[in-house]
A protein has these predicted regions:
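Loop-rich non-cytosolic ectodomains and luminal regions
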Residues: 1-168
Length: 168
């Protein structure tokens, strides 16, 4: 067999804080359980990850390439209003909340790669800033402020590789 097959999957699932109009209001929205203060999907090896690994196992010359995601540091200021989905009369509705929740990636920016991008047999790509004056030393390579970092909940290091992802 010659070469490898690759596929690009530069999308992911909503998790933790996302800014948008999901409730009908442009604001921060919490994509987690109301009682949670930290999003449990970050770093979690879920059904989608298992499916990617099964595909990779059954197609050994195929490499799925996934985006690490861009949620790092996202979230409102502590105590600011955001929206969260709760069940009312058997249906999901968006309600205002001022509950203090951890920004995506917490204080240090780690553990914010969402489920669906933590498979064991996929290549996960993070974003880095451009190096404007040429590479001279490792410190010249700087991850984009928004790009997701691991580790996964089972201790694996993700992302696997970083490429230029700012002002491309």
């Amino acid at each position: 067999k010659n070469g490898a097959l690759v596929s690009n999957h530069s999308y992911g699932f909503l998790g933790g804080f996302e800014y948008g109009n999901y409730s009908g209001f442009s604001a921060w929205h919490w994509f987690g359980e109301d009682e949670d203060t930290e999003y449990v999907g970050f770093g979690h090896y879920g059904d989608t990850d298992s499916a990617w690994d099964l595909i990779s196992y059954n197609a050994p010359y195929f490499l799925p390439i996934k985006a690490a995601g861009n949620p790092r540091g996202d979230g409102p200021k502590e105590g600011d209003t955001h929206y969260v989905q709760v069940k009312e009369d058997g249906k999901e509705v968006w309600v205002k909340s001022t509950k203090v929740r951890q920004k995506n990636g917490g204080e240090f920016g780690y553990d914010c790669i969402n489920t669906g991008s933590v498979g064991k047999n996929i290549l996960v790509v993070a974003a880095a800033n451009k190096i404007l004056d040429g590479y001279e030393k490792p410190e010249d390579v700087v991850a984009a402020s928004f790009s997701a970092f691991g580790p996964t909940d089972d201790g694996r290091i993700k992302p696997d590789i970083t490429g230029i992802g700012v002002d491309v």
